[in-house]
Amino acid sequence: MAKRGGLCVRIITELASAGELGALMQIENACFPPTERCTPAMMKARLQQFPEWCLTARRGGSIVGFIHGMSIGQPAVQDAFYYIPALHRPGAPWQCVLGLAVAPAFRGKGAAHSLMKAYAAKARKARKQGIVLACRAEKQAFYEHMGFVCAGISQSRYGGGVWLDMVQRF
């Protein structure tokens, strides 16, 4: 449970149901610019390909945030990971975050940190070497606060522009 400002957010580490795709997409659309958004079809494909890696934060039964991603072979993000869910390799040593999103009304209340903490605990339990993600420079400090280290400019150009690869080794 994350609690700040009188708000409790409970982390659910269960698969989001197909009926919750609309709620996930509503948050996705509120959090990312059009060039960086996951499409409904792609979100559905990700949920089908790696449901065990889609964690949700809920309040009163409603989804207020989520984190999802795939298992990969190296600590670097590639554009293909965003487009081809079949690249997920369950036994691979690294866990990649493809999306971390919290509804605007619930930001600053600990939901993102709780989601990442739960995701990391799950990755450790799965004996991963660590977590990797790509972020914009303005989010670097946010992820460093969660224990990530900048590994340099990412080879990913997803949605245009420059990304940084952030790595958290276990």
What feature does the model see in each segment?
Residues 1-8:
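Short, Lys/Arg-enriched N-terminal segments with co-localized hydrophobic residues
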Residues 89-90, 103-117, 126, 140-141, ...:
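Conserved glycine-rich acetyl-CoA-binding loop
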Residues 9-24:
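A short beta-loop-alpha structural element at the N-terminal edge
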Residues 113, 125, 137-161:
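Conserved active-site alpha-helix within GNAT-family acetyltransferase domains
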Residues 33-60, 66-87:
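Active-site rim helix/loop that mediates acceptor-substrate recognition in acyltransferases
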Residues 63-101, 107, 117, 157-162:
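Conserved acyl-donor/pantetheine-binding loop and adjacent beta-alpha core of acyl/acetyltransferases
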Residues 53, 129, 149:
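Short acidic/polar active-site loop segments enriched in Thr and Asp
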Residues 95, 116, 121-136:
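Conserved GNAT acetyl-CoA-binding A-motif
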